[in-house]
Amino acid sequence: MPVRQGKYTLLLPSMPGISGYAAVVGKKESEGPLGNVFDYIYEDGMAGEKSWEKAESVFHRDAVTRAIAKAGISPEDADVIFAGDLLNQCTGTTFGIRELGIPFAGVYGACSTMALSMAMASIWVDSKVCNTAVASTSSHFCSAEKQFRMPLEYGGQRTPTAQWTVTGAGATVITQNDCGARIEKVIIGRIQDYSIKDPNNMGAAMAPVDVKLTPYPILHGRRLLYKNLKTGGLNNIG
């Protein structure tokens, strides 16, 4: 069972592990520094579909299916999936995973959805509420532009501060099996509002919560330091 350490940290004694994971992306993402580690690269951003939203559903379903297969299980073995995306009602997710038949708990954490879904999945597994939980998320540059900025058809000029939303999806399978990567603690962040007024510069709005992780997690009366702080979507300006 999870044990609260201090005010913000949840210690997971059983240390749930990541038994399977997958990430699929679009062409632009494949040209970045992580291009050679993705499971699949879609050269066609439409993925053969008629809309950006439907394409995102294809990405999401593909990532979840690949992660489950790499974990050596079937969709029927998954007790729950925590998943979400950037769209209204998480439509990219719901239409993507509906055919898998996994009990679905929708998560809307914007750019924190992957971390939030993994946190929830880990807590459920550690609590023995379930044996196998899936955590996943997706986004698409074109559907996100329509949702948060301007539709591409509008032809608006991008500002120098505008981040580029990932076209892709990621998924993990969280279990109690002996895994190389384990989740020992969960820390839920607090809202940090620095009154950023530029709607294009989402990175600057999100960055403060990453650098203000205080108080540090406390374990056995000793303050712990973070070995690494990994984040995405903030860009150089953020």
Locate the predicted segments by residue.
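Conserved beta-ketoacyl condensing-enzyme motif
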Residues: I18, W52-C111, R223-G238
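Short, hydrophobic/amphipathic alpha-helical packing segments
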Residues: S57-I68, M114-M118, M206-Y216
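Active-site-proximal alpha-helical scaffold in enzymes
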Residues: Y108-A135, I174
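A glycine- and small-aliphatic-rich helix-loop capping segment at beta-alpha/alpha-beta transitions
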Residues: P33-V37, T93-P103, V125-S127, F148-Q157
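Short secondary-structure capping/junction motifs at helix and strand boundaries
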Residues: P75-E76, S127-S136, A181-I183
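Short, well-ordered, mixed-charge alpha-helical segments that flank or form enzyme active sites
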Residues: Q89-T91, F141-K146, Q192-I196, G233-N236
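Short beta-strand segments
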Residues: S19, A83-G84, A133-S139
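Condensing-enzyme catalytic core mediating Claisen C-C bond formation in acyl metabolism
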Residues: M1-E53, P151-L225, G238
